């Protein structure tokens, strides 16, 4: 495949054109008065969105050099969303401003490496400043963060705050589409396993088609159980106690399953069985989690334990277990135990070390299950277009809320970035001359988000920026009302993590663009044009078909 190679100023300008094309489409969504973007879909109705990352992901430019610039902005937006969950549009506006100001200086002869160094050093100092001014999130502030990020939807803000309160900081909150018109919150207490009863004969509540057991003993093993002989010793011990028994195994089949069903039907023993969740190594980890949660032991031949010698002490206990066709919920009621906290800390260390998004999600799920909380926000709307837009807003709000709980909050509406700009002169005092230019580029770029918020609200951006610069730390511009007020008191707040991530990611990509000296991209293949009137020319001869009046003329075919 042939390549196109572009050098020096030409390469940087191509990147800038790509950056501007994408950033100009994304930045109009910023702020409470952000405009909508209409996305054409190959199939179905167009989608109306007010979400920066969604717009960014949809854009692909025809020119391969410019498309490289657009891809860099997509990287900024994606990375910010992955780390902080929100702030993608702010990061896009920042990186566009940094690149625009930076390229002006590179074209004027400033050393791009020194510029990058100045940008990096300034950003590092400003990140430390964000940590200093951030306030921990308490009570109603959680609802305020969620309300702002969901496009000022107070109902959503209250719902997310309620979910966070119920599942605690270790819990998992997910967003799903609902079949109804309303948006509802559903909280699952205890550990939920995505496995249901092996046999419907275990059902105890015929109306709900569920198995409901209380004060339960739990046998946890990674074995496949086929013979009842292996289970007899445990069954006899549990029968003497008069408690129900849940068996969690790789599978229960044949003679073993038949005997359990018969004993359940005759009322000899209240028993149920489910398959172990997960696969491979993850299955063992999940079974170990269940064992720790229920104060039991994983019976595995790998560690020298067998079913026929299992003692009562090896069985876990639970206050209540509900088994449905596809799910099982275990309420252990002792999630504050030191062993559980140790297990959570161990999984959290694994979470810090993993680079895989899938593994990260599964580890976070395990933490939530051990901590005893999973909440589901079921999003409803009248139309599919509205549903998708509402779901995106709620996901943004949820991510912003998690970020706020993690690192605290700062005044929103671009005010914190304006405050950081006022610190740059102090930061750059000991920089080299060209590094100071890099610091000034950051200073000017920090004004861009507030200017854009004001422009989107129909105000004069430069005037708003000038007024906010001269006000106290908490006082800023409320674009929703057009007033200057105490932003924290008004509930216009940003998670510190979002501001930090947006600034760091924007500075990182801007530095890459400024120090780019060459771009190598694949040369687009020219679409091969069909030969002029290929085949159609022959069709002209079809006119002669009229002369075929007598098929006898076909005798001439003998020439072949």
Swiss-Prot record:
Pfam families the record matches: Cpn60_TCP1
UniProt keyword annotations, A-Z: ATP-binding, Chaperone, Cytoplasm, Isomerase, Nucleotide-binding
Keyword Isomerase among record annotations: yes
Swiss-Prot/TrEMBL catalytic activity: ATP + H2O + a folded polypeptide = ADP + phosphate + an unfolded polypeptide
Gene Ontology MF: a single term: ATP-dependent protein folding chaperone
Gene Ontology biological-process entries: protein refolding
InterPro entries per record: Cpn60/GroEL (IPR001844), Cpn60/GroEL/TCP-1 (IPR002423), GroEL-like_apical_dom_sf (IPR027409), GROEL-like_equatorial_sf (IPR027413), TCP-1-like_intermed_sf (IPR027410)
Subunit: Forms a cylinder of 14 subunits composed of two heptameric rings stacked back-to-back. Interacts with the co-chaperonin GroES.
SUPFAM superfamilies from the UniProt entry: GroEL apical domain-like (SSF52029), GroEL equatorial domain-like (SSF48592), GroEL-intermediate domain like (SSF54849)
GO cellular component: cytoplasm
Assigned EC number: 5.6.1.7
Protein role: Together with its co-chaperonin GroES, plays an essential role in assisting protein folding. The GroEL-GroES system forms a nano-cage that allows encapsulation of the non-native substrate proteins and provides a physical environment optimized to promote and accelerate protein folding.
Family: Belongs to the chaperonin (HSP60) family.
UniProt protein name: Chaperonin GroEL 2
Lineage: Bacteria, Bacillati, Cyanobacteriota, Cyanophyceae, Nostocales
Location in the cell: Cytoplasm
Positions that bind ATP: 29-32, 86-90, 413, 478-480, 494
Organism from which the protein derives: Nostoc sp. (strain PCC 7120 / SAG 25.82 / UTEX 2576)
